[in-house]
Amino acid sequence: MSTAIEVTPSDLENKTFLDSNELVLNMGPQHPSTHGVLRVILKLDGERVLGTECVIGYLHRGVEKIAENRTYVQFNPYVDRMDYVAAVSNGLGYCEAVEKLIDVQAPPRAQFLRVILTELNRLASHMVWLGTHALDIGALTPLFYTFRDREEVLKIFEKYCGARLTTHAFRIGGCIYEAYEGFEKDVLDYCDKLGPRIDEYEGLLTGNRIWLQRTKGIGILNAADCKALGVTGPVLRAAGVKWDLRKAQPYAAYDQVDFDVPTGENGDTFDRYMVRMQEMRQSIRILRQAVEKLPAGPTMAKVPKVLKPPVGRIYHSIEAPKGELGYFIVSDGSLQPYRVRVRPPSFVNLQALDKMVRGALIADVVAVIGTLDIVLGEVDR
């Protein structure tokens, strides 16, 4: 008896037989190009992506539940551990949300210090994105340049508050640390250096034939889909939507500085790259103005040592490097929040991955994940 399977010409026309070309492939959770412990289940037909499913939660630490068992002040350092690449932005969003809840406003000097530190952090975050995104696609050199320049931002943070990554730079009511001697000079010197270096980054990538082939027309997400999925940040602006919370709903001292909101046209990987490159230039522009306008005065408002906000609820959001970062806080009048709900941009933007890679090649999945600029500490919380 023969055990061989005979295939007839009619079998080749049978749909069920052709379906055997479909393959389910697990990408991650231990994969260098998922930028964390993300598992992506890919359904493939050859090298074409038919669909994806993201499996998250490998880095879940229960941050929102921890908030219910800490005082408002005690929970402040925890938010730095979500998007640990942009810890300063996390702290700013949380502190401003609690300040709204207790009806306290940070002094003008603190507002400008917050803008300076947050924009430095935006630059550092975008440089991590650029270096790793380029590396994913096969360009090694930009990684060394971007991490070299990011190091100078981390040194400024270290001199300001003693920490480099999870800075805990802000407090409810303002900034606990005064600017160190030479702070303004360090920031302006860095701005002078970084402008030409951004031109160097673009010289390596923007006109590169391989870079263009790997990014142009890849991972398209149009404006309508962005709005339907709740996507924000550079991903939304790359689709042509001019929405930036620093302009639309100004906070801190952003209403006192002038800057543009870069947008794209096609909503593809290349446009998302270009939007972030232009954002870095705008951050330099904001930093120069903020240093020039930095007023004298106290950096902390008068805030009770024991915070006991009145019964109520508040939602406050800021423009983090990756998009809209929001905090919904419910107070029951006790020392601890009744509920803290975080709206992390990485979590929301990741939902768009399936829409962006359907019909693309498997090699393009890595490029699209990189251009979303997700951090799994923020996705999983």
From Swiss-Prot:
UniProt keywords, alphabetically: Cell inner membrane, Cell membrane, Membrane, NAD, Quinone, Translocase, Transport, Ubiquinone
Gene3D superfamilies (UniProt xref): Cytochrome-c3 Hydrogenase, chain B
Taxonomy, superkingdom: Bacteria
Catalytic activity: a quinone + NADH + 5 H(+)(in) = a quinol + NAD(+) + 4 H(+)(out)
Keyword Chloroplast: no
Keyword Transport: yes
Topology term for the membrane: Peripheral membrane protein
GO molecular function: NAD binding; NADH:ubiquinone reductase (non-electrogenic) activity; quinone binding
NCBIfam families linked: PRK06075.1 (NF004739)
The protein's role, per its UniProt record: NDH-1 shuttles electrons from NADH, via FMN and iron-sulfur (Fe-S) centers, to quinones in the respiratory chain. The immediate electron acceptor for the enzyme in this species is believed to be ubiquinone. Couples the redox reaction to proton translocation (for every two electrons transferred, four hydrogen ions are translocated across the cytoplasmic membrane), and thus conserves the redox energy in a proton gradient.
Record-given protein name: NADH-quinone oxidoreductase subunit D 1
